[in-house]
Regions:
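Long, amphipathic alpha-helical stalk/connector segments used for oligomerization, subunit docking
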Residues: 4-112
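C-terminal, non-catalytic "cap/extension" segments appended to globular domains
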Residues: 61, 65-197
């Protein structure tokens, strides 16, 4: 939520831009806030998941999920993972993986047995878009960001999400916070609105 929906928003970039110019005058002398907004929201396939944009990020997750599912089902051998990975990056992202460091070995998850974790990253983005939409129903979240009213956003999360911890399931929390189960349409609307697609 904070990293993508807030920190990559036009309003947040405009808010911090004077500080960037103040504390890094040489680096930002001839830069406009619009340029920074486009830089942090530029859509381009990358090899590294953690360096990817909000849209193609989910292809990275999908590839890892497919591999894990195939490994668990026995339909993919460990010796075939590299080729499957490389073929998937070509198929989904149009990228030829140059080496394992930018490919199959870039994440630490599998080395410590972290199987099944990757989809939670995408789920987080999907929930965040729904929460953003829900907050925006009663408050102008863009105005809140412009005016540094982050405590109000934190309070909404504390009241509707964080206070429950593991007392409720994700779906129960989503239902109580937004009156519906997880709705991928919220993420789609968020992406379409932000990137004008």
């Amino acid at each position: 939520f904070w990293e993508n929906n807030i920190a990559r928003s036009r309003e947040f970039i405009d808010l911090i831009f004077p500080l960037l110019k103040k504390y890094f005058p040489a680096q930002f002398r001839s830069v406009q806030s619009e340029t920074i907004f486009h830089e942090v929201n530029f859509i381009e396939p990358t090899f590294i998941r953690t360096e990817s944009d909000e849209l193609t990020y989910h292809y990275h997750i999908m590839i890892r999920y497919e591999i894990e599912k195939l490994l668990i089902s026995g339909d993919l051998n460990v010796s075939e993972v590299r080729d499957y990975w490389n073929d998937s990056y070509k198929k989904y992202l149009g990228l030829e993986v140059p080496n394992d460091a930018k490919g199959v070995l870039q994440d630490v998850h599998w080395s410590f047995g972290g199987i099944g974790y990757f989809p939670t990253y995408s789920l987080g983005s999907f929930y965040a878009a729904q929460w953003y939409e829900e907050i925006n129903k009663t408050q102008d979240i863009s105005e809140m960001i412009r005016n540094s009213r982050f405590e109000e956003i934190n309070q909404w999360h504390a009241k509707h999400i964080h206070q429950f911890g593991r007392l409720k399931t994700s779906d129960e929390i989503c239902q109580s916070a937004t009156n519906r189960s997880l709705d991928f349409g919220c993420f789609e609307r968020y992406i379409r609105g932000k990137f004008n697609i």
